[in-house]
Amino acid sequence: MFGLNMGVLDTTIMEARNFITAREMLLDGNWLLTTMNGEPRYQKPPLPTWLAAISAFFFELNNYWMRIPGFVMVIILALYNYRLSHKLFISRHLSLIHGFLTLTSFYIIGIVIEAPWDIFAHGFMLIAIYHSINIFSHPVINLKNVIIVGIFLSFSAMSKGPVSFYVLFFPFLIAYFVIFKLPDLKTTVWSILLSLLLALVLGGWWYLYVQYQDTETFLAITKKETSNWSSYNVRPFYYYWSFFVQSGIWTIPAFISLI
C-alpha cells in the first residue's frame, strides 16, 4: 500500500529539503558541493540525496521516483532483519515474523518521508552488522568480510554521519561480545578496527572534499550544527516515550506479552 501511494503523500519539511537538493544536483550539477535553493547545503551527507537524484534521472523527476530508493531500503531492512535473526540461531518462523514486523512497522514506514536520511543510515548499518557476524565466526582475519563491513559502514556514515554507529553498531558489538563466545578476541578486534578504518576513509572523503573546496562555509555550518546539538536539539528523556507506540498496531501485542 505504501508503494502504491508514494506519489500522493504530502511532502515533509525534511523530505522537501532532500528533494530540492536532489533536483539541483540534476539541473545544476551540484553533486559534490550540494545546495538547496542555490545556497550551500552541507548539514547532511549526500548519499541518500544522490540515490534520489539517480532514481529521478533514470525515471522521472517527481516525488514518486525520488521516494523509490527509500522504499527499496525498507524492503532491504526487513530482509536483513530476517537474515540477521536467523543467523543468530533464531528459528526461521520467528525470523520471518521479525522481518514482517519490520516491513509493517509504522516508524519504519514513517521515517522514509519524515527523515529520509535515517532509513538509509540504519539500513546500511544493519547490513554491516549482519556481515560483521561472519567476522566474529572466523579465527583468522577474513579480508572479504572486513571489506564488506567497511563499505556498508561507510555508506551509513555517508547517509547520516556517525549516528547509526552509536545507535546500532556499538551497542550490537557490546551485546554480542557479552552473549556469544568468540573464537579469537584479538583477531576479531583487529578485524573490526580494519573495517572502521576503511569506513573512515570511504565515508569521510566527502567531508574532507567540501572542507577543502569551501572551507569558510563548511566551518560556519559545522559551528552552527555543533551549537544546535548542545541547545535546541537536546530533549528531555520523556520526549522519546512516543517511540514505544511507533510500531503501530504491533504495540498492542507487544504490550500484552509483557503482562
Where are these regions (language model features)?
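Transmembrane signal-anchor helices characteristic of membrane glycosylation enzymes that use polyprenol
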Residues: 1-15, 197-209
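Extracytoplasmic catalytic/substrate-binding loops of multi-pass membrane glycan-assembly enzymes
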Residues: 6-23, 30-33, 39-51, 61-64, ...
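Transmembrane-lumen/periplasm boundary regions of multi-pass, lipid-linked membrane glycan transferases
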Residues: 21, 155, 159, 164-259
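Loop-to-helix entry region of an early transmembrane alpha helix in multi-pass inner-membrane enzymes
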Residues: 46, 50, 59-76, 111
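Transmembrane-helix motifs of polytopic, lipid-linked glycan transferases
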Residues: 68-89, 127
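Membrane-interface transmembrane helices that cradle and orient dolichyl/undecaprenyl
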Residues: 86-87, 128-146
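Short acidic/glycine- and proline-prone juxtamembrane loop motifs at membrane-interface regions
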Residues: 107-121
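Membrane-interface alpha helices of multi-pass inner-membrane proteins
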Residues: 110, 145-160
